[in-house]
Amino acid sequence: MREFERALERGEDTLVATFVLGELRKIVRESDDTQPRSDDPARLLFRSIEPFLADGSTPLRPGQIRRTSLLPVWQWLLREGAPEQAGEFEAMLGRAGDGQPSPQVDAAVRKLQLAAADAIQKITGPTAGGDKQRALSRVGSPNVVEDLLPIAALLQARDALDTLNGRLPSYLRAFGESQIASASSALNVPSLQTPLLLPFALSLVMQRLSSPWQIIRLAVKMAASDDEIRVAATPYGVAVTVALHDLSCLAASLRADIRRGHFANVAENLKTLHDGVRGLRTELDLRSDSSWRKQLTSIRAEISNALQSEIDSVPGRVRRILRQKADKDILAGARIDAGDVDEVAALIDFVAVCRTYASELAINEVTLRTYSDLQQYVEQTTEALVQSLRGGDPRARPYRQAQVSAAVRFCEVLFGRDYASLMSRAAENALTGERKSSRAS
């Protein structure tokens, strides 16, 4: 079990390690049902931190904590950080039975949270005695140590964060002047205005925004200017850093989805990226040589490169399916894979979606050219394929019918359902005419 726990601490193979560790814990619990479940106290202790947890190996931004850091911190608290308080808490949960929320449990959780925060501050503070680095290494990996101070700050400020949560609307479709003023008022709490806690408070606001990039409007409001230098000089300048980080992560996720051929979320992610890039570019006065400008340019370039390479491949994929062959080159039993047709149709739709957001994402020229070429090629080829159904070798006709079906599918994406229905009827008429001609002869 300890090896899997170490793997979680290091962030290695977290999916497999979490699953196997969970199964091992079940076996341990079944072997001694009288012992309180070791993960219940930890879950209760860190429940208030859950909105800020980040999974996976993506780089962390201000306002986030690694989920994999919680287990080592809890084990350290049990072992040496606050063993008496943690032991009392486990015993209390054992007496309570189910550990369900109650005033008694909540009071015990709050007491342990404050004790945990105090223990973390002692080991990380400048007054920590002895070999500080060795003591910190006993808590966990460098990533865990990096998360210690934020964890302590969040545990200590739980009441202030709960109050902020209660004052914020559950969802903010718009983030205009009145909403910005309301959010600013809710955030105006001294304990939340520290450099360590403010990013977490801003994250709570972001989670309620329909367009999370709009969090930069709080920074612009506080600076009373859209000038980058003035915005960066305020504590709320971190909101821009957070927005840029999230856009960068979304761009990386989009690139990974495209490489895997997963297009289900591409339209939504492209819209989010388009709106975010445009929002930061238009609502902030960014200098050409600034760090924020370079980050934004890098995000646009990453999106552009990922999209352009995929867009360039689409016409070739379409031609491989619709290319007309001589009857002698069509083998008996030749077929077109339905999965290939579905994939190419999704790619054509992908190009159409890219066209909507092309100008802001620096892919305008390639997208418009590719889409125009696809329209011209599919229109001409579909008409030619329909005509080919009127004659030719009967043995090749099933393959040509499959080509026409694929072409009609592509027409629906490019020209709409009405045009696709028109070409489908034309294909049926061509086949009917050919059958009549064959009977007459």
Predicted segment positions?
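Extended alpha-helical scaffold segments
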Residues: 1-389, 393, 397-398
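Short amphipathic alpha-helical coiled-coil/interface segments
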Residues: 270-273, 404-407, 427
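Helix-capping and short linker residues that terminate individual alpha-solenoid repeat units
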Residues: 278, 285, 412-413, 419
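TPR/TPR-like alpha-solenoid repeats
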Residues: 280, 377, 381, 407, ...
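Beta-rich interaction/scaffold domains
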Residues: 297, 417, 421-438
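Structural helix-adjacent loops and short alpha-helical linkers that scaffold large soluble proteins
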Residues: 362-366, 414-422
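TPR/TPR-like (Sel1-like) alpha-helical repeat modules
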Residues: 401-416
